[in-house]
């Protein structure tokens, strides 16, 4: 799996979680989860659950501030799966 594939799947998960009806194609690596996409702490928790289901990767996020952008989440998943990270 590549980081592009991770991004594509994660964009779909995120698009399902936000209330503003964002299309997966609008979720870029540099999209900020809270500011740009409107993801709140409950949606982050749901997103982490779905990440575990879809990717088999458990992200230990003790501080939600460690996942500020989609790129942060993609890289966290890639590291968990022992894959190269997105630049």
Tell me what each language-model feature is.
Residues 2-36, 43-49, 53-87:
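Phosphopantetheine-dependent thiolation modules in NRPS/PKS and related acyl-activating systems
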